[in-house]
Amino acid sequence: MVTNRVDVFWHEGMLRHDAVEGVFDTGYDPGFLDVLEKHPENADRVRNMLSILRRGPIAPHVNWFTGLPAIVSELLMFHTSEYIEKLVEADKSGERCEIAAGTFMSPGSWEAALLAAGTTLSAMQHILDCHGKIAYALVRPPGHHSQPTQADGYCFLNNAALAVKLALNSGSCSRVAVIDIDVHYGNGTAEGFYTSDKVLTVSLHMNHGSWGSSHPQKGSIDELGEDVGLGYNLNVPLPNGTGDRGYEYAMNELVVPAVRRFGPDMVVLVVGQDSSAFDPNGRQSLTMNGYRRIGQIMRGVAEEHSHGRLLMVQEGGYHVTYAAYCLHAMLEGVLKIPEPHLSDPIAYYPEEEANAVAAVESIKTYHTEFVPFLRGT
């Protein structure tokens, strides 16, 4: 008998976003290549995530729900009206345009973005209304790079941040912890809550730094928040090549203690499978087992602090097949499924965690000195 289930929120309209072809994510055709590649954030990656949840071994543990599109008033919980107007006007033009580096809006993109935001809001509302405790918003385009005033990194609207705002505005949540395991810094979410002590944002990412005007944040350990939010933005830049043991060490030594000190009543896990060993858009070495352990740890965090309430929001993950396998493994961990139902098809990358452990210990020392609410841990 299945007693442990995840409520998955999805809408087919999100497949209509077409992020162009070219050289990787540039949309550029140099004229001398016979075969161009799809943009890494293409619909195929999400189709496989969808199908593995529908037809894979985990399918009996999944309840399906259809998300609703967000409306403008909901978007204004996080984004400025000027920015939303810019997106609306770009959509009205009916032409393909590059909103930010590598971030293309085409006919159908705005509809998909509204569905991604609204589907995530639907999932959070589902939890707030006590219809379920564990929900996963399977959405695209992704959102965690989108800032209140601008697009960035394939992201138009910050889906997870909007869900956090909804939770805080509901009256039933006063403190939300957001844990981001995408391989890239969740700069948009961090930016939106940078002066808040109601939201703890923790981002585990490769140490990539800033990548231009749309992404001025570095994701470094000294970006701690400002004013009353000082100390509530914790960055964990991990060395390239960090794998399962390194991520588990960071989760247990940095993330879990910080969340325990913060004491949230809602937990949001921002998920990217681009931290896997084979992702074209990252340089880390997580395998299915690593994602499974993260799922187990996050389930424990939710049970300890938020009465088991856990919202998961999909972000990156660009290996068209392996990202789906990693999602399956993570949800197995969240659902406490005792043994893996799928063997890992390609995980053979050797891991040396010494560099990751050294980085985590250095970050821990920094936090105890400069983060007020973590002093004494």
Swiss-Prot record:
GO terms for biological process: chromatin organization. It comes from the Eukaryota. It is an enzyme of class 3 (hydrolase). The active site is at 145 (proton donor/acceptor). The record marks 318 as: Polarizes the scissile carbonyl of the substrate. GO terms for cellular component: cytoplasm; nucleus. Residues 5-336 are annotated as: Histone deacetylase. Gene3D superfamilies: Histone deacetylase domain. Its EC number is 3.5.1.98. Belongs to the histone deacetylase family. This is Histone deacetylase 8. It comes from Arabidopsis thaliana. The gene is HDA8.
